[in-house]
Amino acid sequence: PAESVYAQGEYVQTLEGAKSPFADVVQTVMPCVVGVSNRANTFNMISGQTELIEQATGSGVVVTTQGHVVTNYHVIEGANDVQVLSQGRYLKTEIVGYDELTDLAVLRVMEDVHLPAVKMGDIAQVRVGDWAIVIGNPLGKQFADTVTVGVVSALNRELEGSSIVKMLQTDAAINSGNSGGGL
């Protein structure tokens, strides 16, 4: 008969009572991460009316207590209307500015609500092998506030034909809808 192939005895440590070092980071940062809804005017052939229809979703990070949100340009590209999703509620926003070359956009929440702002990190302190925590809204509202974890795989990556320079590479799961979210 085959012998047991699972770890046992003194080599096995229990995780009972152990706390994740990621949980504190997530608890602090998650309220600063919002969903971003890109809506465009679309003609409805049945009703004969023009309607705002969601054409893309992504994520963003609140960077000031005045409601400024940083996201990716490709998340808001072509939008006639942009809203952010915070704590289950859509908030009206305006596009403050964007840069197609760096794929960045800044939004401002137009409603009088308090949104906590994230404390930005220093990219110069990031090293290959450091943990990477991604917080975002993969696939939109249904999966809002999703967390994935990986490591920083490389720094200063450049893609041939890309206008974005000095990218950070991670192996953390990033899905459609995470664009613009917290890393």
Residue ranges: model-predicted function:
Residues 3-183:
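Serine-dependent protease modules
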